[in-house]
Amino acid sequence: MKKILLALLILPCVSCLNQTVNMETTFLKNRTFDEVWEASIKAVNDIEFTIDSIDKEAGFIGAERGRHVLGGDAPPRISIMVKEDDRNVSVDCKVLQKEQFIDVLGMGKKIVREFMIALNQNLN
């Protein structure tokens, strides 16, 4: 019985880990690509991320925050895609943790929310 209980306690600890990904998309009407692009850059800076990759033609912004979580080197990475179609502009915000970090505290969802709030503030 003790061996079964021990196995049940250890099994979750040795299971395969997936990289933590949190994503949200917002659609903005009556905004130009350039307005949303500039607001997105400001929003990334407002939430204290450092932009390390940017391509306006592709609509891509990549950034990283240099924080260490729980004594480990697992800074979150954010990827922003700004796209324009006939009627509106969309913004995809994706946050992922490097090095198979488990997002126990829900940091990824919080970062997505912070970015979306900062984006809306910069557009108003």
Q: Which stretches of residues belong to each language-model region?
A:
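Ser/Thr-rich, low-complexity intrinsically disordered terminal regions
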Residues: C16-N124
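Sec-dependent N-terminal signal peptides
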Residues: I4-V14
